[in-house]
Amino acid sequence: MKFSPLLDALIRELQVLPGVGPKSAQRMAFQLLERERKRGMQLGQTLQRALTEIGHCQHCRTFTENSLCDICANPKRAESGQLCIVETPADVAAIEQTHLYSGRYFVLMGHLSPLDGIGPKELGLDQLDNVLQGGQWKEVILATNPTIEGDATAFYIASMAKRYQINITRIAHGVPVGGELELVDGTTLSHSLSGRRPLE
């Protein structure tokens, strides 16, 4: 069925969101128009403000409305001497939800991918090099994704950090908690076996 040009445009623009196809976008558009017009207006205003006002933290490059994010603005977060390097701001949120890490972050906003034109410059590795030179870091935790690109990025950063005599660690990955071995793919299982540690 053909809708009005404006409704078609709304449905098309909603599909920019991850996991939203034509049917889901149509349901969202109808919901906003049929029942949630006031909330839809608020959504539009908030979205416009967010896209205009949210930028990157000057230190770690995560999203924030201020020059520094809350983590970088907190001096206690530097006391651990730990710097966790992640690919995206969503990774920061995931690690923060564990409540197990109290250091600072550096967000790459991606990973090395020469075929896509993403090299060290695009990831801000020159800025990271300046951060590493500060002399305050005891440990760099490489928390890039366990993919070919994520591993390549981690190895590249590790070679940078070694110049400053910083302890370099990589997050463990392997069999998920509650997972069954027969359902785990071979690559993940091989990582788990090679990354095994003594039982304490």
Swiss-Prot record:
Gene Ontology biological-process annotations: DNA recombination; DNA repair
Database matches in Pfam families: RecR_C (PF21175), RecR_HhH (PF21176), RecR_ZnF (PF02132), Toprim_4 (PF13662)
Residues of the signal peptide: none
Zinc finger (C4-type): 57-72
Matches recorded under InterPro entries: DNA_Rcmb_RecR (IPR000093), Rcmb_RecR (IPR023627), Rcmb_RecR_Znf (IPR015967), TOPRIM_dom (IPR006171), TOPRIM_RecR (IPR034137)
Protein family membership: Belongs to the RecR family.
This protein's name: Recombination protein RecR
Gene name for this UniProt entry: recR
